[in-house]
């Protein structure tokens, strides 16, 4: 089994192995995954945090070993909380709100023994309930993008998944999956 991680700001994940195929979700910086199948230009991946499958262009994959993958599986994720932050190893690059900072220590993330200096705000674990609303309002007027997961283009279930991620809660990717978890509340007296 091969493993990978996103070291780019945003990577499109497609339904089929083609540049013109539907984008079903996006990988944000620091999100890791299993590589299920490798073809000439594309790899089929299983995203760790939500078990979502799709195709990613091979040029956009950073390979990690199983030991690093297992370490990432066990650690409590540190998450960037600003609309746009800067992270850099050799060069600085923007990362969006909700990106993961693997093996985060004080001001840097670590991927494949390479340090990525981080300048911005982050959170780890559960946040106060009022932060949920504050974070949600940041996405006000964000454009709709099918499969999107950033303030620059987002869909309904991507929005819900990211807002709760910032609260330390893992949710599945699609709305139908999200509706199947949690507790049903009755708002009408019976």
Place the predicted regions along the sequence by residue:
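Short, flexible active-site loops
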Residues: 139-149, 178
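Boundary regions of SH3-family modules and the immediately adjacent low-complexity/disordered segments
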Residues: 1-2, 18, 25, 29-32, ...
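...with weaker cross-activation on analogous glycine-rich loops/strands in unrelated enzymes
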Residues: 169-190
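Short, conserved secondary-structure segments in the cores of folded domains
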Residues: 23, 91, 183-187
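Active-site nucleophilic cysteine motif
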Residues: 136, 150-167
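Single-stranded RNA-binding regions, centering on S1/OB-family and related RNA-binding modules
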Residues: 5
